[in-house]
């Protein structure tokens, strides 16, 4: 069984993407807490590998990730790719509960307290045939550098 961590594609959620393109990565995960992500295409590569080599995966739980960054580090990556400053802003947890509900509140509380624990260096060593994308590689492959040109900077 493969267990993917948070999807890099979550950055396409409207409010998240618009905020980033306007220079603000807003997230309820603490600034000092590493957050693991993976590209959906990398999940597909692992699924294909599991079918090709079932003996390695049957009865096993393999947590998979390609990137591990704190939110300030992720903001720096977005800044490099977009060619303009992106700053991290921590969202207060009570806002998460109020606007997103109990389930999202519990999920982000878990991210802040524990979070995913995929061993990325070990995954890269054990499965060299799968190129696990870093956040920067994924952003560039997805064309985020072009997206930045279509959004006006915030006033003020």
Predicted regions and their residues:
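A hydrophobic C-terminal alpha-helical subdomain
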Residues: 93-156
């Amino acid at each position: 069984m493969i267990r993917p961590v948070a999807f890099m594609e979550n950055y396409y959620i409207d409010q998240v993407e618009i905020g980033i393109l306007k220079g603000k990565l807003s997230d309820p995960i603490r600034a000092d807490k590493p957050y693991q992500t993976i590209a959906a295409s990398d999940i597909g590569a692992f699924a294909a590998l599991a079918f090709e080599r079932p003996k390695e995966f049957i009865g096993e739980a393999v947590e998979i990730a390609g990137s591990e960054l704190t939110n300030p580090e992720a903001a720096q990556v977005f800044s490099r790719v977009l060619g303009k400053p992106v700053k991290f802003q921590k969202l207060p947890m009570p806002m998460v509960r109020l606007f997103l509900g109990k389930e999202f509140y519990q999920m982000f509380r878990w991210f802040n307290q524990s979070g995913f624990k995929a061993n990325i260096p070990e995954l890269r060593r054990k499965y060299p045939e799968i190129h696990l994308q870093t956040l920067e590689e994924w952003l560039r492959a997805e064309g985020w550098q072009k997206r930045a040109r279509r959004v006006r900077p915030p006033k003020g």
